[in-house]
């Protein structure tokens, strides 16, 4: 009997511990979003030396002229570099340069330069996305060892704006706002060390369940996004199509991907689509 009580007490403690680890943040903590923290969870204040300014709401749509296609002109076109890092002074800035940048200075001492401009914190999101992030903060929790999300369907963006673990930071990147449903034309170059390169051209389409009003909520409940990519050049690859249903909890339901091979005129499942593929 005594052993049974000990086991029951231990199980209860483990349950409480698991609940505390997996719990979303409190309403009081979430209230920091938009106050001392930006709506997406960054520090609103700048740094001590002023090289990183305070966030003041981000870039507004009236910050510069908009062209006929709806693209914003460079609002900082008139700025000049504060200084330029070259092979001659790279040692002075060594603590702020990556190993790759230092290697570039050694390999191309005459031509490789890094002009350093003033920092601007331009990130801004629609009010609905900021509200979604706050909703995520008090509701969303990780499941399946951090490989999935629970209570995320109501918000759909920025799963953990006040992250407590590295996994939650990664989820914020995965669930970031990307401007809604998107269609883009991409040209991909693979340069060689001798300067030669080959080009592959794609048409990409991305759709998010939150921006698909006609989608049955039950069908999209575990889908983060839908992705379609069609190759348009070179001719040997043109017509190939990739379709992906990117799932949220990939332990519960792995990523669904298919490839249409125009040369073979066949559709096949594509389990190899992962990590940095497709490019």
Feature roles, as predicted:
Residues 27-254:
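Solvent-exposed N-terminal domain segments of exported/luminal and surface proteins
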Residues 9-19:
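Bacterial N-terminal signal peptides
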Residues 236-279:
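Loop-centered beta-sheet repeat module
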Residues 8, 42, 270:
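Functionally constrained cores in energy, signaling, and assembly domains
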């Amino acid at each position: 009997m005594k052993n049974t009580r000990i086991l029951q007490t231990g199980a209860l403690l483990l349950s409480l511990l698991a609940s505390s680890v997996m719990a979303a943040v409190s309403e009081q903590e979430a209230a920091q979003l938009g106050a001392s923290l930006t709506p997406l969870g960054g520090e609103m204040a700048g740094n001590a030396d002023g090289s990183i300014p305070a966030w003041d709401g981000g870039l507004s749509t009236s910050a510069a002229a908009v062209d006929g296609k709806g693209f914003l002109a460079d609002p900082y076109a008139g700025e000049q570099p504060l200084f330029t890092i070259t092979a001659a002074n790279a040692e002075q800035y060594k603590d702020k340069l990556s190993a790759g940048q230092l290697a570039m200075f050694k390999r191309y001492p005459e031509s490789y330069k890094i002009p350093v401009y003033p920092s601007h914190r331009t990130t801004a999101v629609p009010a609905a996305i900021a509200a979604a992030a706050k909703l995520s903060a008090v509701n969303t929790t990780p499941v399946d060892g951090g490989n999935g999300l629970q209570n995320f369907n109501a918000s759909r963006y920025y799963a953990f704006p006040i992250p407590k673990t590295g996994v939650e930071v990664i989820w914020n990147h995965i669930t970031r706002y990307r401007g809604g449903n998107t269609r883009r034309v991409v040209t991909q170059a693979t340069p060689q060390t001798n300067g030669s390169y080959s080009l592959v051209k794609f048409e990409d389409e991305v759709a998010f369940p939150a921006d698909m009003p006609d989608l049955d909520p039950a069908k999209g409940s575990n889908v983060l996004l839908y992705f379609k990519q069609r190759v348009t050049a070179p001719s040997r690859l043109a017509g190939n199509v990739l379709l992906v249903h990117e799932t949220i909890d990939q332990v519960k339901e792995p990523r669904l991907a298919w490839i249409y091979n125009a040369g073979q005129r066949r559709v096949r499942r594509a389990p190899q689509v992962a990590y940095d593929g497709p490019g």
